[in-house]
Amino acid sequence: GKYMYSDLGFVFLKNIIERITNTSFDDYCNNTFYNRIGANNTCFLPLNKISAKNIAPSAYDAIFRKDTLKGMVHDPIASLLGGVSGNAGLFSNANDVAKMMYLYMNNGNYAGEHFINKETIDLFSAKNNKTNRRGLGFDKPDLKNKNLSPACYSASAESFGHSGFTGGLAWCEPTNKTIFVFLSNRTFPDE
């Protein structure tokens, strides 16, 4: 069959986590991960926590919100869900993103504390079928056609990461313990 990218599973994952934990998704993420690893600039709805002057605009939305999106999620599904979703809406800086990638690269451990089982990280960072290079949660390098790969030519098969529509990219190379984070606002002012 034909491969088509979809992030709807992560939209539903938010609801599943909320139902199982009886906690809002943003509180769950903050209390389970971000606060515990010192990712103090990572949050949903950043205008409630971070000064607008420290947030880059992501786009001008001429259709739906008719405003410059600064501190507001770009993704329309996440926006309709109030800005907190499993597929989009998380704001951060490079240092905090690197902390999360370090946690993934180190089998779910950060600063001597265990957060995620290695088997879960392996499941989300492995290719899930032969027709595309994506895993359940992360992208993989395209080793057959490096011109189409989201990673550099020297990326190993073990590397994984994800790029965002608005211009963010985080990549992890477990083979040589390297993390790459690039944050931009490529969709501003026009997509």
Regions found by a protein language model. Name each.
Residues G71, G164-G167:
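Glycine-centered small-residue hotspots that permit tight backbone geometry or close packing
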Residues G1-E158:
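Short, surface-exposed loop or secondary-structure junction motifs
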Residues S159, T166-I179:
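Short, surface-exposed beta-strand/loop micro-motifs that present aromatic residues
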Residues R186-P189:
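A short acidic/small-residue loop/turn micro-motif
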